[in-house]
Amino acid sequence: MGFIGSNVAVRLAAAGARVTVVDCADPGCGANLRNLAEAPEIRIIRADIRDASAVEGALRGVDVVLNIAGEISHTHSMRNPARDADLNATAQLYFLEMCGRVAPGVRVVYAGTRQIYGVPQYLPVDESHPVRPVDFNGIHKHAAVAYHQLWSDSGKIDARVLCLTNVYGPRMALNVPGQGFLGSFLRLALLGETIQVFGDGR
């Protein structure tokens, strides 16, 4: 029910897909039930992706899983690395094991982050760029990418990984701390407040 997931879910439902959303509804991660209000046909299951009883039922009969579960805050990961590891790495292990067992061979599209590459050594950053995360969020997200690749290589699932960066658009949370600088900048601009830019802004 967060920013990216809700946009994809609403578009898929409008295209005629049968959509089920599994979300723990953590407001600190951007969850907002109103994001899905325009698509009442979407089935919503409020559960953590580690909740086998909820997730296994949701996985039965699906063609594609869009896996956007996790914590995206880099600052939160540095304050509480164990929590970030639990949400972004350990939870993915549980979830992928369920996918392989309940829906063998299912296509899983994982929304990773460009943050796994760290400070760019060249632009544009591509898949050949060295992996050098600069925070725990990047480390744990990289572990999740490796889990998806391993499960896919073993034939249990058919995984695809996207490395997203600075995504913005409709339904973006502007008032959730730690959700990226774009939302913060937009909120400050709307409030007519000063936006502080460090360095030359590049």
Regions found by a protein language model. Name each.
Residues 122-123, 146-202:
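NAD(P)-dependent short-chain dehydrogenase/reductase
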Residues 1-167:
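N-terminal Rossmann-like NAD(P)+-binding domain of SDR-like oxidoreductases, especially those catalyzing
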